[in-house]
Amino acid sequence: SGNTAKALAMLSAARGYEFTAIVDKHAPADKLNSIRAYGGKLHFCTDEQDKEGGHLVDVRRETARRLAKENNGINLDQYDNPENPRGYYTTLGKEIDKSVPDADYLVGTIGTGSSLSGTGLYLKENNNEIKVIALEPKGSSHFSPHGHGYFISGPGYPAGAVLPKNINRDIIDVHDYVADKEAFNTMRFFAEKKGLLVGDSSAMTLYYAMKFVRENPVSEKIKKIVLIIGDSGESYLSHAFSDSWMIEKELLDENISKELSEFYI
């Protein structure tokens, strides 16, 4: 989706590295422009390659391996590199455990699965009672081979692609979906009503938290729910925050905003 590439482009600029992101036309333009702004280069994989060489996600991964080898570079491989979830295990997991040692639930989205897997593993090792809830876009195929298209670009994984090794399914207690319409209208609600510019991954957790609490009224068993708010909305200005784009895709829904207003007072 481009979130990791943005971060790596920024780090590379600060440390003087040459950086190339392997992308396709489906990545949001705002993210691609951010990578360019940090001096990063973009290598585009095409839909034609998708038809010839397997799923486009797998084409991107193979292209990254090939270019790294040809140019004496390093392919960080966010999908299978165990250092990815380990980074969250040693940082975010510890931070949350220190701040909320008695949390009942951890809610986060899964793309490569690294942030939720690493964080969730640390918390479970230190809190036997915590439950981990994994969210993916409706249409994603992490837990079902029968996916379909969706517009959310942060979390999720398309049907037919080789699944990442970084997802630790053993620590996931509950799995659920959030639809495009729910996520994008939540993004717009928090920007317009709360002054918070959140991305689609963050919006998924915020919407699901409302749904979860409503379906499970606060009781002695549910006291503290920790949400991973993992992305900013600045990378989504050209679609989720664009009225014309939302209308074109038939995603605007005032009822969702009303529902959120009643919950997030």
For each of these PLM feature ranges, what is it?
Residues 1, 16-29, 221, 225-229:
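Conserved PLP-anchoring active-site segment centered on the Schiff-base-forming lysine
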Residues 1-15, 28-32, 109-120, 201-209, ...:
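Short glycine/serine/threonine-rich phosphate/pyrophosphate-binding segments
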Residues 2, 12, 35, 76, ...:
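Buried hydrophobic positions in well-ordered alpha/beta secondary-structure cores of metabolic enzymes
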Residues 11-26, 121-131, 242-249:
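A glycine- and small-aliphatic-rich helix-loop capping segment at beta-alpha/alpha-beta transitions
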Residues 20-105, 137-185, 191, 264:
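Small/polar-residue-rich loop-to-helix segments that shape phosphate-bearing ligand pockets
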Residues 22, 77-78, 109-110, 134-136, ...:
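Short beta-strand segments
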Residues 165, 210-265:
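Phosphate-binding loop/pocket of nucleotide- and phosphate-handling active sites
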Residues 167-220:
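Active-site-adjacent helical/loop segments in soluble small-molecule enzymes
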